[in-house]
A protein has these predicted regions:
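Phosphate/ribose-recognition catalytic cores of enzymes acting on nucleotide-derived substrates
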Residues: 181-298
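Residue-level signal for inorganic ion chemistry
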Residues: 11, 64, 103, 163, ...
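Glycine-rich, Lys/Arg-enriched anion-binding loops that position phosphate/diphosphate groups
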Residues: 126-228
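A structural preference for short, hydrophobic beta-strand core positions in alpha/beta folds
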Residues: 34, 74, 135-136
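N-terminal catalytic cores of NTP/NDP-binding nucleotidyl/phosphoryl-transfer enzymes
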Residues: 1-56
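N-terminal Rossmann-like or analogous alpha/beta NTP/dinucleotide-binding catalytic cores
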Residues: 43-129
Length: 298
């Protein structure tokens, strides 16, 4: 049972397609397989228009497995593949995937050279090979269907609640704690720093959420700044995720070299430059108080 799609973000719309494949695999004692690409096709065809990805290939594969896929095929999207006519796509799948039974897609699925193929052509082509095609209905949130592009826009605007609803889970920032300049500790707000800079990322600002230590699975509440630290950095620098834990941690378990995973629950404010360090300290304390209040019911 083959689920087809780009699956960037593995949002609730994608999950509807994946669920069809899982249901069919269970019904026919088959295998649920996801077929996707490691990069967006536009990266090759229209690089100036290629959208930033919500997930790298490894993270996408991990989430596809979490949603019930038993195998994940990341087909390289090269020039040769981009020139495949839509009428030859199903034949290609049958030649490369033995015992293919069912194709599961979303209503807006497109395939083949110049994106000519749609769900109707796929059904016609599949019939010739004795395959069935199942089309998942679109999932909606707010004023329209859920899509990766809507999630990217919501991220850029700090609308974390909308992002989490469309993903069907909390948005995650993950990485290894790296050494910092200890300014946070000096001013009374020690931080755990992650060099985290994906293609598509949240707007620079302050967030509240829960942080998970991937070594021991402990979760603690935190407030975090994601950005370029304009008060402290006088020249351009790479974005940094600075996490301040809201409870006193075991410093042996929460330290440099540990992998952390932060889920974003609330956007507090945009990042800004302060005229004086005391102004920054006062704002961080205010952010901390707000985060404690917001996270206490969780």
């Amino acid at each position: 049972m083959l689920a087809l799609g780009m699956f960037d973000g593995v949002h609730v719309g994608h999950q509807a397609v994946l669920n069809l494949a899982v249901e069919q695999a269970n019904a026919f004692a088959g295998t649920a397989v996801a077929f996707s690409f490691p990069m967006h096709p536009s990266t090759l065809l229209r690089p100036e228009q290629a959208p930033p990805l919500l997930m790298n290939p490894e993270t996408k594969a991990k989430h596809l497995i979490l949603k019930g896929m038993q195998e994940v095929i990341l087909q390289p999207f090269d020039h040769e593949f981009s020139q495949m006519e839509a009428t030859g796509f199903v034949e290609f799948l049958c030649a490369h995937i033995p015992s293919l039974h069912t194709l599961c897609i979303g209503k807006n699925f497109r395939f083949g050279k110049n994106r000519i193929g749609d769900h109707l052509l796929l059904q016609e082509s599949a019939n010739a090979f004795g395959l069935q095609v199942l089309v998942a209905e679109s999932e909606s949130w707010g004023d329209g269907p859920v899509s990766s592009s809507r999630i990217r826009a919501a991220l850029e605007e700090g609308r974390i609640g909308d992002v989490n609803q469309m993903l069907g889970r909390k948005y995650l920032m993950e990485g290894m704690v790296c050494s910092g300049n200890a300014v946070g500790r000096t001013i009374g707000f020690p931080t755990l720093n992650l060099n985290w800079n994906p293609q598509a990322h949240p707007c620079f600002g302050v967030y509240a959420g829960m942080v998970k230590n991937l070594r021991n699975d402990q979760k603690l509440p935190a407030v975090a700044n994601y950005g370029v630290r304009p008060t402290l950095e006088k020249s351009s620098c790479e974005p940094l995720l600075e996490i301040h834990l809201l409870v006193e941690p075991d410093t042996e378990q929460w330290r440099t070299g540990i992998e952390l995973q932060m889920e974003l629950d609330f956007f507090l404010r945009p990042e800004k430059a302060f005229a004086a360090l005391d102004d920054l300290k006062a704002q961080i304390q205010s952010d901390k108080n707000q985060a404690l209040e917001l996270l206490s019911p969780l």
